[in-house]
Amino acid sequence: MLPVSLYGASGTELDNFFSVLPTLVENAYDDRPYQETLFAITGNDAIKHITIADSWDHQTPFDWPEDLLMEVGMAVQTIKYPDVGLLEHLMTLDNVDCRRLFIWMHFETNVYPIYTKEACRGLDKLGLPTPYDPNDIATYGLYVQRIEGLKLHAPAEGMPEIGLPRARILQLGLERY
C-alpha cells in the first residue's frame, strides 16, 4: 500500500527505481567532502554547524549581528522533522533560500533532504510532480513529504546500507535516475 504522499506515482516506476537504487548510489560513500562535513557536525553549536555546511556548499560566509545569530541558532535547534514552516522567516535573510536553509538542516539533523532540481526531476519521472522553487518553502515541504513517502515505501533490499542518511541516499538516487 502506498503512503498518501506517493499517490499518483507509477507503481512500475517505483519498483524500477528501488531495483536500481543500490547501483545508482554505490559510489555515494566515496564522496569525502560530504562525509567529512557530515561527521564534522558535533555538539550543539548550530552556528558553527551552519558555517561548516556553508563551506561544503561553497557559500559566502555570513556576517550577522549577535542577535540575529542567536535567532538563527535557536530556530535551527528548535524545529523538528518533518516540519519546515517554522524556518520560513529565515528566508528573509540575504542569500538564504530553501536550498541553502535545508542544507544547513540536513547536516544539523541528518534527516532533512537536500533540495535539488535534479531530485525533483527524478520524482517527476516516478509520476510525482514536485516543483523546484528554492524561494517557496511550500514546494520544499512537498519535496520532504515525497522523500518521506519513499522511505516508508522502500523495500528492504531497495535501500542500501552504506552509512549515509536515507534522505541523502534517496536524493542522490533521484538525481541519477
PLM regions and their residue ranges:
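Catalytic DNA-binding helix-loop module of base-excision-repair DNA glycosylases/AP lyases
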Residues: G85-L126
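Phenylalanine-focused residue identity feature
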Residues: F17-F18, Y29, F39, F62-W64, ...
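Generic preference for well-ordered secondary structure
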Residues: E71-M74, R99, I103, P131
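C-terminal accessory module of base-excision DNA glycosylases/AP lyases that mediates lesion recognition
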Residues: M1-D54, T116-Y177
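Helix-hairpin-helix/helix-loop-helix acidic hairpins
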Residues: I47-D94
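A short, ordered amphipathic alpha-helix with a cationic face
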Residues: L24-V25, A75-I79, T109-N110
